[in-house]
């Protein structure tokens, strides 16, 4: 499926290939900084949820180039795809913004925990914690 987001980076941001966003990334526009800070860049993904391509809660979908790389570098990375991707997830509320393979390894642990221990109560807990993260935006890039 195609991940829909509000554009927060310059249109040529990935001209040299995909790369993780960094703190104070110069590719992010002024408007982009605001929409990332208030996390509204994710709002269009509700359409993907309504179409059944995503869930509100699940492992965050990743850029295809990163998926290919991480599949090779991280054992069990593909296992995170046994559940639908989500707008928010266990990794997002428990680990700060990741921008490296090592960060992806840590987030994978949370994604696998979620896939193995999914319950409606866990989804509710994640949604409540997501509201906290949106209201007090720590770690947005």
Model-predicted segments: where are they?
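Conserved small/aromatic sequence motifs within transmembrane helices
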Residues: 1-141
